């Protein structure tokens, strides 16, 4: 195996007691790591003695996010995957099988009872390693969660031998999947925006009765969102709209001011990133954002109406992610190429100055949002693990 990141003192270490051992395969991007961490937290609540191991690679966000959350991380060789299948599994590059061998070693090390996979290049080796070898290696049960509207290659492969399959939305391409939503951290799902609103607006310097637009494009920001919204700053201010804009740590935001701002103009608060998304969500009335699965899940879980601007890459997954909320009336989709300053000023002003319409969108977004997905995925995995033949044989001794 590659280098190993050990848990903080007092964390959940590796041992071989009677507690259930769960391996989470969700490394790489935030869209894979964050749902895995939400499920880890839910597992710890449902089964306080559970032993949790996250599987990841040295190049993924998990090297920072997993230890920060207090969980144990094991690293394997990264295996970037194509978006579409390209031949039989036997023809996959040798590094895949190296990653599978490393993953088998991890599963043995932690005496895994169940693997929960979230797709991506960490999940595929985990699914293959969990299959076992008749007469040589025991099979380990697998639970799959698909966050995107269109399932990726890893989860489509894992589907063949998975014991339970769950998804964020219907028709993800995974046959027999149970729709539960996207696992979201408890700090977001438990958020009461109205109760926190006064504190949140004071934190960012907004008036209690402000009309607040929140803009963010993910952890690195989004250049097209930055340009369109910042160029509309004067028009938004003239309409009484305050803005909280997370532009990304690598980006510079230029506010164009064709008119002289007055002392009573609503503030335009620009920050590189937001480390308190709960306060940002509580302060906002409307959001402009991308439509990655995790973003849509969080925004709808807290009941915020949104203008979703799908990232114009891939197979159109981001647009599909937003459609359930949009079709329910909780948001709208604007193509990246159509996001102009004029459109921003027109749509944002129109929504924030029409309380009945905004209230209807808010209610629709909240209705679509899932707040218990993490607990449902965690419970499914615990149920599968307890029923596994290898677990039953192990009662009173090692497997």
Swiss-Prot record:
Cysteine pairs bridged by disulfides in the record: none
Domain of life per record: Bacteria
Residues passing through the membrane, by range: none
Catalytic activity: di-trans,octa-cis-undecaprenyl diphospho-N-acetyl-alpha-D-muramoyl-L-alanyl-D-glutamyl-meso-2,6-diaminopimeloyl-D-alanyl-D-alanine + UDP-N-acetyl-alpha-D-glucosamine = di-trans,octa-cis-undecaprenyl diphospho-[N-acetyl-alpha-D-glucosaminyl-(1->4)]-N-acetyl-alpha-D-muramoyl-L-alanyl-D-glutamyl-meso-2,6-diaminopimeloyl-D-alanyl-D-alanine + UDP + H(+)
Keyword Cell wall biogenesis/degradation: yes
N-terminal signal peptide: none
InterPro entries membership: GlcNAc_MurG, Glyco_trans_28_C, GlycoTrans_28_N
Gene Ontology BP terms: carbohydrate metabolic process; cell division; cell wall organization; lipid glycosylation; peptidoglycan biosynthetic process; regulation of cell shape
A Pfam family matched in the record: Glyco_tran_28_C
This protein's record includes keyword Cell membrane: yes
GO cellular component: plasma membrane
Keyword line: Cell cycle, Cell division, Cell inner membrane, Cell membrane, Cell shape, Cell wall biogenesis/degradation, Glycosyltransferase, Membrane, Peptidoglycan synthesis, Transferase
HAMAP family, per database record: MurG (MF_00033)
Function field: Cell wall formation. Catalyzes the transfer of a GlcNAc subunit on undecaprenyl-pyrophosphoryl-MurNAc-pentapeptide (lipid intermediate I) to form undecaprenyl-pyrophosphoryl-MurNAc-(pentapeptide)GlcNAc (lipid intermediate II).
Protein name: UDP-N-acetylglucosamine--N-acetylmuramyl-(pentapeptide) pyrophosphoryl-undecaprenol N-acetylglucosamine transferase
């Amino acid at each position: 195996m590659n280098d190993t990141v050990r848990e903080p003192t007092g964390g959940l270490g590796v041992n071989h007691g009677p507690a259930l051992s769960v391996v989470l395969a969700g490394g790489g991007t935030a869209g894979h790591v964050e749902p895995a961490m939400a499920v880890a937290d839910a597992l710890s609540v449902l089964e306080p003695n559970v032993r949790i191991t996250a599987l990841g690679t040295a190049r993924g966000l998990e090297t920072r996010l997993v230890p920060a959350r207090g969980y144990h991380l094991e690293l394997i060789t990264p295996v970037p995957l194509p978006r579409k299948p390209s031949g039989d599994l036997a023809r996959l590059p040798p590094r895949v099988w190296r990653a599978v061998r490393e993953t088998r070693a991890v599963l043995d090390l932690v005496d895994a009872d169940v693997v929960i996979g979230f797709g991506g290049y960490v999940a595929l080796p985990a699914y293959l390693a969990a299959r076992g070898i008749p007469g040589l290696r025991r099979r380990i049960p697998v639970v799959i969660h698909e966050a995107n509207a269109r399932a990726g290659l890893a989860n489509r492969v894992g589907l063949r031998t998975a014991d339970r399959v769950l998804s964020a939305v219907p028709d993800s391409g995974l046959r027999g999947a149970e729709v539960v939503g996207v696992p979201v951290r408890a700090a977001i799902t438990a958020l009461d925006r109205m109760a926190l609103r006064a504190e949140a607006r004071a934190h960012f310097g907004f008036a209690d009765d402000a009309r607040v637009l929140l803009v963010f494009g993910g952890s690195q920001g989004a250049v097209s969102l930055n340009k369109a919204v910042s160029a509309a700053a004067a028009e938004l201010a003239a309409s009484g709209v305050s803005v909280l804009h997370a532009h990304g740590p690598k980006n510079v935001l230029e506010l164009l001011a064709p008119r002289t701002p007055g002392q009573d103009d609503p503030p335009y608060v620009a920050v590189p990133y937001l480390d308190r998304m709960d306060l940002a969500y509580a302060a906002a009335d409307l959001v402009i954002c991308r439509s990655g699965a995790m973003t849509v899940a969080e925004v709808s879980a807290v009941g915020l109406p949104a203008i979703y601007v799908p990232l114009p890459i891939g197979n159109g997954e981001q647009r599909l992610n937003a459609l359930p909320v949009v079709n329910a009336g909780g948001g709208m989709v604007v193509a990246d190429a159509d996001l102009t300053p004029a459109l921003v000023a027109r749509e944002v002003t129109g929504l924030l100055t029409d309380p009945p319409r905004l209230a209807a969108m808010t209610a629709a977004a909240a209705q679509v949002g899932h707040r218990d997905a993490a607990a449902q995925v965690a419970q499914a995995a615990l149920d599968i693990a307890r029923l596994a033949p290898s677990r039953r044989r192990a009662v009173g001794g090692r497997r």
